[in-house]
């Protein structure tokens, strides 16, 4: 009896050792220094909602603000299909603009933030409180184009950036209507209840900006504001050639930080929250992180301003269909392929993906 039990024990112990060895072998296939994105964040995709809520030529800086953030998130990998850009006025084509088709955020004209490939989703009088709230909550009207929908889900990290003229508890849209802090809080709460975000970063550059996040109660929300209640947010500098301010102070220093960030940067949200100290911003930057479960100093900046790049390492054999002489034609000393090559990884993906 004792011998039988001893044999069983040895067999079980051997199986445990074997399973541990297999697990170790599987882990060892990761390249040195490789960090799985899932270890850093639970999100699976990124979205950005960028809003300039004011119009008229003297608010040129607000368009420059939003286009500066647009430039940054697009450069860091978020595609236009996952960026909703709302601009209340078209400064690039304004009759007062001496540089048609161009918008700069600096009097030295270092960066044309309008560029050649800006995709504006809501333009002019389409930028309304109703459309903004419908966008956030997923209640867009029938017939709304896909490019005008926030198609986020429970795995989405969402960046919301707002700029314009505001006051204690409100932000003006088009100088004719307002969205209140309570309406913003309700919209974000609906997003949470409908599983429309995993984590949300709320960023606002306006006067008394911190008042806009005071009503928030939804989980996983991190917020930053360019000024506290009772403070004005100030502009940075004037371009004498066009007679208006170019950009606001907070967004200017935020862009200065983001321009140094690369897609695989180790810079953190915690660092970003400190980009505009009072000595340069004049106003006091407000931060709200009581609803956010992670330490901002351990959250990569690209969790919100970049696009996640899921990577899976496989040890499966890859069959490569090699070319032969019949696959090429020669035309004036140029070699041109007639048939596309196929690389097929067995047992990993359905064959229709390679058709």
Swiss-Prot record:
Protein name listed in UniProt: Putative GPI-anchor transamidase
Record Gene3D superfamilies: 3.40.50.1460
Gene that this sequence comes from: PIG-K
Record flagged with keyword Protease: yes
Native organism: Drosophila melanogaster (Fruit fly)
PANTHER family assigned: GPI-ANCHOR TRANSAMIDASE
GO BP annotations, alphabetical order: attachment of GPI anchor to protein; GPI anchor biosynthetic process; proteolysis
Keyword annotations of the record: GPI-anchor biosynthesis, Hydrolase, Protease, Signal, Thiol protease
Known role: Mediates GPI anchoring in the endoplasmic reticulum, by replacing a protein's C-terminal GPI attachment signal peptide with a pre-assembled GPI. During this transamidation reaction, the GPI transamidase forms a carbonyl intermediate with the substrate protein.
Family affiliation: Belongs to the peptidase C13 family.
One GO term describing the cellular component: endoplasmic reticulum
Active site as annotated: 165, 207
EC number: 3.-.-.-
Pathway named in the protein's UniProt entry: Glycolipid biosynthesis; glycosylphosphatidylinositol-anchor biosynthesis
Example GO molecular function: GPI-anchor transamidase activity
Signal sequence, start to end: 1-24
Superkingdom classification of source: Eukaryota
Alphabetized InterPro entries for the sequence: GPI_transamidase (IPR028361), Peptidase_C13 (IPR001096)
One Pfam family here: Peptidase_C13
């Amino acid at each position: 009896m004792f011998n039988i039990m001893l044999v069983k024990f040895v067999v079980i112990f051997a199986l445990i050792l074997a399973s541990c060895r297999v697990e170790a072998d599987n882990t060892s296939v990761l390249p040195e220094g490789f960090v799985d994105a899932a270890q850093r964040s639970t999100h699976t995709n990124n979205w950005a909602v960028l809003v300039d809520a004011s119009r008229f030529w003297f608010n040129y800086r607000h368009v420059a603000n939003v286009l500066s953030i647009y430039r940054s998130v697009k450069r860091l990998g978020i595609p236009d299909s996952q960026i909703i850009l709302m601009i209340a006025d078209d400064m690039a084509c304004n009759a007062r603009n001496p540089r048609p088709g161009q918008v700069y955020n600096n009097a030295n004209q270092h960066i044309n933030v309008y560029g050649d490939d800006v995709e504006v989703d809501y333009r002019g009088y389409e930028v309304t409180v109703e459309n903004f709230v419908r966008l956030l909550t997923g209640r867009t009207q029938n017939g709304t184009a896909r490019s005008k929908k926030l198609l986020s889900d429970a795995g989405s990290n969402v960046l919301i950036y707002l700029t314009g003229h505001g006051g204690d508890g409100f932000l003006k849209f088009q100088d004719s209507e307002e969205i209140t802090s309570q309406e913003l809080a309700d919209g974000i709460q609906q997003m949470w209840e409908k599983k429309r975000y995993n984590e949300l970063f709320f960023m606002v550059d306006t006067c008394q900006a911190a008042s806009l996040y005071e009503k928030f109660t939804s989980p996983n929300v991190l917020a930053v504001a360019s000024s506290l209640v009772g403070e004005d947010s100030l502009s940075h500098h004037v371009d004498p050639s066009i007679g208006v301010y170019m950009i606001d102070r907070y967004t200017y220093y935020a862009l200065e930080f983001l321009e140094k960030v690369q897609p695989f940067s180790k810079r953190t949200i915690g660092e970003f929250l400190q980009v505009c100290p009072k000595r340069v911003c004049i106003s006091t930057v407000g931060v709200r992180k009581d609803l956010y479960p992670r330490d901002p100093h351990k959250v990569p900046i690209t969790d919100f301003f970049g696009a996640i790049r899921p990577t899976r390492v496989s040890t499966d054999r890859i069959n490569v269909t090699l070319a032969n002489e019949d696959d090429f034609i020669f035309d004036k000393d140029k070699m041109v392929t007639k048939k596309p090559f196929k690389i097929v990884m067995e047992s990993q993906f359905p064959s229709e993906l390679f058709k």
